[in-house]
Design a protein with these regions (language model features):
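Alpha-helical scaffolding within the catalytic cores
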Residues: 1, 47-49, 111-112, 140-149
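Catalytic domains of carbohydrate-active enzymes, especially glycoside hydrolases
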Residues: 1-7
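Active-site metal-binding loops of divalent metal-dependent hydrolases
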Residues: 9, 131, 197-199
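Active-site gating/metal-coordination segments in enzymes
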Residues: 14-109, 116, 159-168, 175
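Proline-centered flexible-loop/turn and helix-kink motifs
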Residues: 31, 122-123, 156, 189
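Non-cysteine beta-strand/loop elements that form the S-adenosyl-L-methionine
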Residues: 60-68, 125-131, 158-162, 190-195
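Active-site cradle of extracellular carbohydrate-active enzymes
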Residues: 114-118, 132
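H/E-rich (His + Asp/Glu) clusters that bind or coordinate divalent metals
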Residues: 135-210
């Protein structure tokens, strides 16, 4: 490993700054991680104070706020779609002021709205998480994922992490994931794709070596 990026590990809102400061202390002592993506609830009216505290740590590069919303309660992470929330949109816009990127974790049913938000803020780099998380594996779900990925790929400031395959298919194999991986690279190109481990979460579904 040459360099490492730490993505927020699910810290509660009141612990997010403490997590970032702890990670920065590790980097100061041992060099790792080289970059930090912290957590901030962008729909918090007080989010600017949180962002200002995050960037006090020099290795902070971005923010992740998981906003997966799905009409099926089995899949949804949030009680409502925050891409329809004006307070969230205002919080998102503040990322540019602090020079931060956004790790966007959504489902394909949110991609059209995500496209509109990202297009309105070309100065905020976006990293789409977990291959776009196409959890609906039927024909309609596949078509929605493909069209959403194609739309997001038209924005040059949007990149994608190929990861989280266990979220998509808990019994995944190389053959079952190959089309998703290749289609993602085809749409975004090699310069806007990165492979990410998503460990330890993906350890639930397979080994790191696999």
């Amino acid at each position: 490993v040459v360099k490492a990026v730490h993505i927020d590990a699910g810290a509660r809102p009141e612990e997010a700054i403490r997590e970032t400061r702890w990670l920065q202390s590790l980097a100061d002592e041992g060099g790792y991680p080289h970059a930090i993506v912290g957590f901030a609830a962008l729909n918090d009216p007080d989010v600017e104070r949180i962002l200002a505290q995050h960037v006090e740590s020099p290795n902070v590069r971005g923010i992740r706020h998981i906003i997966n919303w799905h009409p099926n309660p089995r899949y949804t992470y949030t009680p409502r779609n925050l891409l329809e929330d004006d307070t969230f949109a205002r919080g998102y816009a503040l990322l540019a002021k602090y020079g931060l990127s956004f790790d966007m974790q959504i489902y394909p049913n949110q991609m059209v709205q995500a496209y509109a938000l990202a297009k309105a803020h070309p100065d905020i780099p976006v990293i789409l998480n977990h291959t776009g998380m196409p959890v609906d594996r039927d024909a309609a779900g596949d078509a929605q994922w493909k069209s959403g990925m194609e739309l997001l790929a038209t924005l040059p400031h949007v990149a994608v992490k190929i990861s989280g395959l266990g979220f998509i298919d808990r019994n995944w194999t190389t053959d079952s994931m190959r089309p998703l991986v290749l289609e993602t690279i085809e749409r975004f190109g090699t310069k806007r794709c990165a492979f990410a481990s998503d460990f330890p979460t993906d350890k639930l579904f397979n080994t790191y070596a696999h």
